[in-house]
Amino acid sequence: MLRLAAGILLATALWAAGRDTVLFDTDSGLFGDDGAALVMLLRSPAQVTVAGITVVPGNVWAAQGAEYMLHILDLLQRPQIQVYTGARTPLVHTAAMAHEAGRRWGKLEFMGAFADNPADVKPAPGAKLSLRRPHHEGAVEFLISEIERHPGEVTILAIGPMTNIALALRLRPEIETRIKRIVFMGGNVQVAGNASASAEFNFWFDPEAARIVLRSRIPQKLMFGLDICHTAVLRKAEFDRIVAVRTPITDLFREDLGNRYPGFLKHPEATGYMWDSLAAAYLLDPGFVTKSETRYLDVLTVWGRFYGSTVPLDRRSVPDATPVTVMQELNFKRLFGLYHDRLTRQD
């Protein structure tokens, strides 16, 4: 009882402190851009409070993503942050559909969890499975309860497919206008896709979920799509600056980005992208974005060559939908300075 009371008092104090309170919805791989996004926020306690981490299928299945998130929390010694496992699958899209699309219209650039065994949960390389387990409450229920308890105060950082969020909106449509804002990585407006030729991965993995969110009445929707993400290029020079500072986090960064994607240790000429880290950085320093525009957007949900593509919204069919602020250009020096600072800090 004392432990429960202390937890309630701590939560109340955090909400009252005036920080930006974030629900962190992720499809985390081993580290990559999702892990970097989490580290950046947790090392910025004066600016944001991470109220909880909800995991969605995308890069990997949700159970594996939860394990990776727990491992990062263990490294950061943040036992108070809870991880909630969300939807087991996208709303409609299946591995069979994805494989058939590849056969019909050409090889897909990236299939994420559709290429993996959903029952296969592995520890991070060189580690054991975390002794912690995800919270017994589901991610969708947690999202709903936090939004209902704190109307107008919650920022959702959505850096994976939007399945969890779409399910929350479908179960409780009234929470749409109680969300302060959603900052998300997903979609592409004027550049090619990175899953199929026309679709960005997060939207492609669950197009129906992305459509629900884009057509919603959430007051503010801020989009970090491929248009801006592909201007934030990581090269080995930036990689070397980070791994030169040895910490458990930079060692994990080195293992993942060095030996997996982009593989800087094997291919020094390789390049990678910061993707989800841009959306997290915006919560800490929005000034690194130098150009944006407002659009009404939708997602194609008819299965075919263009499934998951971002398209203009026909406002006649959805007159209540709120617009999307599409981020377009950035100051990379300012962004990387923030990224480097947070990833190399000593805990």
Predicted regions and their residues:
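Short, hinge-like loop/turn segments at secondary-structure boundaries
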Residues: 69-72, 100-102, 239-241
